[in-house]
A protein has these predicted regions:
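Thiol-/selenol-based redox modules, centered on thioredoxin-like
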Residues: 128-165
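Hydrophobic h-region of N-terminal signal peptides that target proteins for export
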Residues: 9-17
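Short, internal strand/loop/helix patches
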Residues: 95-129
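Hydrophobic beta-strand anchors of alpha/beta hydrolase catalytic cores
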Residues: 47-48, 77
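Conserved redox-active cysteine motifs that mediate thiol-disulfide chemistry
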Residues: 50-64
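Structural microenvironment flanking redox-active thiols in thiol-disulfide oxidoreductases
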Residues: 60-100, 113-117
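A short beta-strand-turn-helix
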Residues: 25-46
């Protein structure tokens, strides 16, 4: 009986899981990626969120951004894993999947000289995360250092929606 139970467990463990609604993918964020990102989202309201696997506040904020993305499909949501501590793609992808951000455009810093990448985004940025940059339709950028409050994101979204009327 014990062998039968162990065999059943082994069989269940080998079966594929339920298909994910959408599998997250990571693009490599390297020199020139910031300008490429801005160019590809030009004319659309875009929320760019810098986060990291080892960032405590990011673990709380990512699911909130997933909810924001679900409620506001007119906003392009981009996440960039800019962790100071190198981490695996699998860890980042797992967090994005859990947070409901699989359908977002997801990037990961891929240059060993992260300071150069941060400088391209904002010359004054010292690497603190979480960090959110809200890019309006006309390219105007608003930076939120630390956790982005849901009310601030909603206010920005309402301004973007009003600008199209």
């Amino acid at each position: 009986m014990k062998r039968l139970i162990l065999a059943a467990i082994a069989l269940l463990a080998s079966l594929p899981g339920a298909p994910a609604s959408e599998e997250a993918k990571l693009k490599l964020f390297e020199r020139g990626s910031w300008q490429q990102l801005l160019h590809s989202h030009a004319g659309r309201p875009t929320l760019v969120h810098f986060w990291g696997v080892t960032c405590g506040p990011c673990k709380v904020e990512l699911p909130e951004l997933g909810e924001f993305m679900k409620r506001h499909p007119a906003v392009d949501v981009v996440t960039i894993d800019a962790d100071l501590v190198p981490n695996s793609d699998a860890a980042a992808l797992s967090m994005l999947q859990t947070a409901g951000l699989s359908a977002a455009e997801n990037w990961m810093f891929s240059d060993g000289f992260a300071e150069r990448l941060r400088f391209e985004v904002d010359p004054a940025w010292q690497g603190d995360i979480p960090r959110t940059i809200l890019v309006s339709r006309n390219g105007e950028m608003t930076t939120i250092e630390g956790e982005a409050e849901a009310s601030a994101l909603q206010k920005w979204f309402d301004e973007q929606a009003a600008a199209t009327k």
